[in-house]
Amino acid sequence: MNADTLELARVGDPIALTRALVSTPSVNPQLEEGGSGEQETAALVAEWLDSWGLDTRITEISPNRFNVVGKLEGEGPTLLLNGHLDTVGVSGMTIPPFDAKIEGGRIWGRGSCDMKAGLAAILAATKRLTEEGPRPNLIVAMTADEEHASLGMYALADSSPSADLAIVTEPTRLAVMPAHKGFLWVRAVFMGRAAHGSRPDLGIDAIRHAALYVSALDDYGEQLTSRPAHPLLKHGSVHAGTIQGGSAASVYPDACEVVLERRTMPGERPEEVVQEFQRILDELSEREGDLSASLEQMLERPGTEVPEDSRLVQGLLKAGQEHGIPPAVEGMTAWVDAALLNEIGIPAVCYGPGDIAQAHSADEWVELAQIEKCADVLESFARDLVTQGA
């Protein structure tokens, strides 16, 4: 990162901010051995926010994992702007991950799309809001660990931030995304009986039973698509993510474990989803008398949505149109931290530069124009909250 880029970043240039952030590694250490974590990036962000006059705090939410929160007084409602500091790993990348090269109207590098461009848009808008003109009360919260377990957002939520509405600048191609699916993981363990491969009369094949169960999920998936469609998210889905079983080709396997993922819709209850998995298992058990299996719920994250007619959604659409962005409201397929803000009563939507298709890719990039437009829209939306009630 050269001195000119740093100087431009300090005065709030969105492109320079993006390049400075991409040039500062923040690989989640839970996802790649030797990952640097968020400490250096958090310190850089905190330095900028503090120099712009925000009341800024760095919090260690877990050993060597850091959140940054800056607050700026204004008038009227309180707007929370959020993004995550961490990135996925760099293994397998086909470009230098931290060069932040500009070429073809794009910035290239790990985290450029997911989501350091979004952080830069927040920072650029924040710098402008510190200057003349109306502004709401502002909370800038940049969190750790979204790519793994959302430790940073859970810590932020536990601190009970007092905000009226929130924007999470995940990559949405500058479409407003007020809804996204949740997910639930279930571990299915099938127990068989080990025996020599030449003795089918003695063995019970746990892998066969697991395969029958996974095959039965095809019908379950079709049932999900036959349910009434969500206007933005359409339908839930189900698939098997991992499978482990057996000890040798010549031995009937006595155990097989399958981890299943169900993508859920806003409002679906996890216990009801687990019951659906159990129903399928019970039906299979009736046909296969020697089947023995158990289900265990693992990780669950809720789906979420904000009404399309809310001031948050409509205000962002209006601010976008002021800057020549055609209005677009879409659903987000991935799960993001916005759901946890909605859970604590802060309406949150996703709106940011970049395309989720580029996130985590081997040659990750983001368009320069989208970064600049996003900063413009965030500033306009924030000011409109005060002058027009957005």
Regions found by a protein language model. Name each.
Residues 25, 49, 170, 210, ...:
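Residue-level signal for inorganic ion chemistry
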